[in-house]
Amino acid sequence: MSRTASYAGMTTPVKDKEGHGIPCLQPIDVVECTYQYFTKSQNKLSLRVGDLIYVLTKGSNGWWDGVLIRHSANNNNNSLILDRGWFPPSFTRSILNELHGVPEIGNELEIFQAGLNLKLELSSNPVILSLEDFLDCCRDIEFKEQLAWSPIPVHERKGCCELLYYNQDLDVYCRTLPYLPQNQVETVNDYSSFPAISKIAGKKMPITSSPDLFYLNDCDVVYWYDLTRLVCHYVNLTERDLLANEREKFLTSLDLLTAQITCVYMLFRNLRLVEDSFKKTLKKLIYTLSRFSINANIWFHSTPFEEREAIASQKDPERRSPLLQSILGTFQKFHFLLRLLHFLSNPNELTILPQLTPRFFKDSFNTISWNNPFLRKHLNQHMSHDLPRQMIKAVAGASGIVAENNDEIPASKQGTSCSSETSHHSPSAPFQRRRRGTIFSNVPGSSDESDTIWSKRKKPYPLNEETLSLVRARKEQLDAKLKQMIKSANEYLSNTANFSKMLNFEMNFKTYEEVSGTIPIIDILENLDLTIYLNLRELGDENRVFDEDVAIDDEDKEFLKHSLSSLSYILSDYFNMKQYFHDVVVKFIIVAQHLTLEDPFVFSPMQNDLPTGYYEPMKPSSLNLDNAKDKKNGSQNTDIQEEEDEYEPDPDSLILFHNLINQDSDFNDLKFFNLAHVFKKSCDDYFDVLKLSIEFVNRLILERENLLNYAARMMKNNITELLLRGEEGYGSYDGGETAEKSDTNAVYADSDTKDNDEWRDSQVKLPRYLQREYDSELIWGSNNRIKGGSKHALISYLTDNEKKDLFFNITFLITFRSIFTTTEFLSYLISQYNLDPPEDLCFEEYNEWVTKKLIPVKCRVVEIMTTFFKQYWFPGYDEPDLATLNLDYFAQVAIKENITGSVELLKEVNQKFKHGNMQEATAPMKTLDQQICQEHYWGTLYSTTESILAVDPVLFATQLTILEHEIYCEITIFDCLQKIWKNKYTKSYGASPGLNEFISFANKLTNFISYSIVKEADKSKRAKLLSHFIFIAEYCRKFNNFSSMTAIISALYSSSIYRLEKTWQAVIPQTRDLLQSLDKLMDPKKNFINYRSELKSLHSAPCVPFFGVYLSDLTFTDSGNPDYLVLEHGLKGVHDEKKYINFNKRSRLVDILQEIIYFKKTHYDFTKDRTVIECISNSLENIPHIEKQYQLSLIIEPKPRKKVVPNSNSNNKSQEKSRDDQTDEGKTSTKKDRFSKFQLHKTKKKAPKVSK
């Protein structure tokens, strides 16, 4: 803020003892605060009525600079506190030349009304300090924070430099460093400096109303200003009701005012403001309030209503009755004492007050009844019940213990009579083992008794059909018992006379048996695995905790945001259903217990007559006297609303009811009804909530499948991986279908695997110097494949001279980068080439070792190296350390030793490392069609409906298949590995150009089809387009082009297309059935079992597979299986410390890659139409995203006003389908009808009635 001023208050220097002029604080005016002004800004002053401000500068921008001097809150000394800052002059009045007091009080009521809106009395005798006294105060001030003085050099004309000291807070320059009082050094007697003693010597501190500690309401009192404003509001409201002659409202306002005065008294006690002046003022305040209450009641009882109304309506106070004037005078005195008490306390307006109203601690109350995983900050710590740190400190401080965490809290208390020095000597036990006697004994989640079912189950229930079957099976078992209980209730209603008391006890017993059978369902509802929805919320958060290496583009973010908004209400309804389940079961138990009571209404008088939240503070927006009356009436009318009685009245109870009326007894607004009818209704509700639980579990399962279905169809494997991260079972993924490949689909068949057992037996018969050294470190699987092993063992098996395992060799060379670095891998091969002979060999044994092992191993090493550089080399494998291996020298040595294949190895090494241009040498040759595309050969675009419908579906599907198969053939195994590994093993992989182009083409095709439909305004043309694309998808299926077929289906089931009900009605049913059959083929249930069966039956036919399944298999196999195996010994809990490579994981990856490569070998025998292909390619560019298409969809078919209730048993085929099934009005009404709370006794809740 600028300090431009018209008057400067610091120009006159003050000379010190040596005669040097020093700039100092010199006020130019003195003003008194007339209105309260509060601010949180550090450079502005917070003002109270009556404060004196010494003005230093009057700024031209409307803000003045001043100094405020107050006495310290510590009344034991006369120290001063100085505040300097900006303040608005409109809240003050100048008193420098007006040294006069406030006019004497003439009319008490008018002055009281003038001060209702927080206008405290001004000082009658303001004391203004002289300049000398003011400077003395400035020298002896006690600052809130220690002032920082910065040395600043100042150059004068003679060239010398002078050092000044500048304080930014005061904006003051000094020639010498001022002497300021420092805080006294804490002595050893201060027990708070010692952690061990402070726990027992610390004072009990009140728990403050911190928003970070509690779930506060908007109307909660946090600061002194809020409390003062609230109390004054009730004061004004009480007086207004008194003068308005409204007795019932007056008593209500007086009751609320008394409650607020009680809060004030509690605050003074909690803040330890117990000086004599405070005690006396508080006593006078309470006494005055009591006197006012008594006099007001006398006024209402002794004076008739009409007379009171006439007296209160008198505008002249002198014509009012003496009793009313006395009441108003007492009330004014009460208001004066309240302001006096506030002035004496002299608190800091920004100090947070102690918490008085009951509120839930944050992140702690969710473990009482139902578990809410969305409240956990650490999503993977399902079993963690640690309390929040702030809650621990607050509760411990309230008990006089200074604790930072759970372990510092004593395990038990020794008793109040123990001295502080011997109370706690032993270390505190862990918090989780503490049961009774601690300060957290009554805190939810602090003991084992309050733990939920979640903490007792090790694994959550997955969201699948198996879990749903468990719920259904349990419900069927409960239905049979429940029907019998309903039958008994009906018999009672039909024949009450023969219904014995013993039968009531029997029904009560069956109720408990029924409820105990509900525990498995509660267990499932409590422990459902909602990890995918938790991850969805975290993905939508800007500060997500996932790896930064995961790239999420704008389209993915749009999809995640859309999914989160459409699923949020389902999750909200699910948790409401759980609470509704709890309410129904509780009511079921209570009603069953009432059957055994002689008087079922015996506990009714214990019910509170006041509505819930009666004493809650009012919102700041409602603290306006003009509309407070209407708002209060509306609130009370809402609270006393009563639902219509659904229960059949009991004739005997009605007789009792009329007798009570005749006797003028208080019946507390009870509704008497037949308990058997209530029991039957409770059974029906219990039956319905069981059905409701199955419905919601089924909905969560379907929404999970829809979410993964969309991600899989759009080939967003990164989104799928993030959504499933941390889900139970995700870490132990079993490839299932992917591991079982037919012989015709297997590219590399190892015919020798059948003889592996015989070969391993033959190795044992060899001499020790010819046996492999690391055979004991190999782990074999049941399919005669290597499951794992150490690095040395795998290299030894790779270069074995007798056993050539072709599948192992290919798997190793493809996936070696997940085991070794390139330098490390080649170093192992060179070490294997230079094998050292075993010790203690004779001459004949050495010659045999060289002939039968060393030379063959050298040949295998050269062969493996040559194959690696020739067929499996990737530019991303290059590393700077490879130059240290001198591979060309190694190849030349092999040539000198006449090793087979060494010449070809030297040629490959020179080509890769000396001639450069590795990427150009190894990059696949581009096809002629791609070169033509780059020469900007543009065909006619399919930009209109007529141009699309003019193309024959067979021709369109044929050319689409040719184009997509060509793109599919450009996908390499390195593209697939790059897609799943990313930067996991190396940062030089880069992008996956072939695979990214294939995925981009499929997504563009989906957007093109959906956009072609929504941009058409005519409904009949849209219907023709739908049928046209369905026929194209059918022909794509006949051509085994599952990629294009899935892209078309995804477009037709997208949110912007599926919601067009009028357009779909114009499509003939046979065509819609055809679409359903295509969608059923790509159903993601059971890991695309229908599609996998269809794909497996193709054998040698050409095909363009749906790549989303491959991406899911690759992602799950890589992320769901560990890189290393841990072998367990015979002793429990003892593990082998040596790491064994999980080679089975690499084998599964290669199995999937084999199938991908297999479909690249068989080509289509179709004639290529270059014009159609170019039109298709060019039409897919510059298509709007899904959000723009959805807006167009709303334009051509707006949302209906009335909600269409969807079939709850229908299976939504994609995440976008259910987006429009619910409207806001529908959601609200459904929740209200489905989760309405029950009350056994329908009692009106309202304020106490007072007759006039």
UniProtKB/Swiss-Prot annotation:
GO terms for molecular function: guanyl-nucleotide exchange factor activity. Keywords: Cell cycle, Cell division, Guanine-nucleotide releasing factor, SH3 domain. Residues 26-97 form the SH3 domain. Residues 782-914 form the N-terminal Ras-GEF domain. The keyword Magnesium does not apply. It comes from the Eukaryota. Residues 952-1199 form the Ras-GEF domain. Residues 416-428 have a biased composition (Low complexity). Residues 409-454, 623-648, 1201-1252 are annotated as: Disordered. The keyword Manganese does not apply. Suppresses the CDC25-5 mutation in yeast (restores cAMP level) and has similar functions as CDC25. This is Guanine nucleotide exchange factor SDC25. It comes from Saccharomyces cerevisiae (strain RM11-1a) (Baker's yeast). The lineage of its organism: Eukaryota, Fungi, Dikarya, Ascomycota, Saccharomycotina. The gene is SDC25.
